[in-house]
């Protein structure tokens, strides 16, 4: 049972000893170029409005010290994560964002680059962040330790939050899907089906929210080092 339950997270599809499941990470790239040679439809108009809204919000979070075009990185990050979250809801498509391999690969380099930029170019500003304003002198050494630890675990919390949310929803859907064939009557089967549809809608919302949270927190971490 446990093997079947977690088999959806196992990248085991191979051809010539090459794992193919991770190629699903780039499936979203095949959907984007189509908009450049087709007439705009409602989906493209909505998507462009979403990107413009995100650009304005990220620009506000970065403040006047943000470089021109810096929001493009965070919008691309949001798009990549959201595409992978949504594609993982389709049958037989591997959910790459349910693995720390991908989420840590996104979170750690971003955090490390922000820290290197901040400590090299704004050293005094970074030291000032270690002691919140109004801290009593007696508590300053403890606050430095606490702030340092909270700063170091940021990439881990970013990665684990996204991974845990993706795993939890998929496990619930898998559990309900496995109990469907064992349903004794149509009433229980219809109840399971209704619950699965509700969970699928909820997972769609989680896919958007978690990609938005990941991008917004990355933007906030970037704004702190300026």
UniProtKB/Swiss-Prot annotation:
It comes from Anopheles gambiae (African malaria mosquito). Belongs to the ATPase A chain family. Keywords: ATP synthesis, CF(0), Hydrogen ion transport, Ion transport, Membrane, Mitochondrion, Mitochondrion inner membrane, Transmembrane, Transmembrane helix, Transport. One of its GO terms (cellular component) is mitochondrial inner membrane. NCBIfam families: ATP_synt_6_or_A. F-type ATPases have 2 components, CF(1) - the catalytic core - and CF(0) - the membrane proton channel. CF(1) has five subunits: alpha(3), beta(3), gamma(1), delta(1), epsilon(1). CF(0) has three main subunits: a, b and c. The keyword Electron transport does not apply. This is ATP synthase subunit a. It comes from the Eukaryota.
């Amino acid at each position: 049972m446990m093997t079947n339950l977690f088999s959806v997270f196992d990248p085991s599809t191979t051809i010539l000893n090459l794992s193919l499941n991770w190629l699903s990470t780039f499936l979203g790239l095949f959907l984007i170029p189509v908009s450049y040679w087709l007439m705009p439809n409602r989906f493209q108009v909505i998507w462009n409005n979403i990107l413009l809204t995100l650009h304005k919000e990220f620009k506000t979070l970065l403040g006047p010290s943000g470089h021109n075009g810096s929001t493009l990185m965070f919008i691309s990050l949001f798009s990549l994560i959201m595409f992978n979250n949504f594609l993982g809801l389709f049958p037989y498509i591997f959910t790459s964002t349910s693995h720390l391999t991908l989420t840590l690969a996104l979170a750690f380099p971003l955090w490390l680059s922000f820290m290197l930029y901040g400590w090299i170019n704004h050293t005094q500003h970074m030291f000032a962040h270690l002691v919140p304003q109004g801290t009593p002198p007696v508590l300053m050494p403890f606050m430095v330790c606490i702030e340092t630890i909270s700063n170091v675990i940021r990439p881990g919390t970013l990665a684990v939050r996204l991974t845990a949310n993706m795993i939890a929803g998929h496990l619930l859907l898998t559990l309900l899907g496995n109990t469907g064939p064992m349903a004794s009557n149509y009433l229980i089967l219809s109840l399971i089906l209704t619950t699965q549809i509700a969970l699928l809608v909820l997972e769609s919302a989680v896919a958007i929210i978690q990609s938005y949270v990941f991008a917004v927190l990355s933007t906030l971490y970037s704004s702190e080092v300026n």
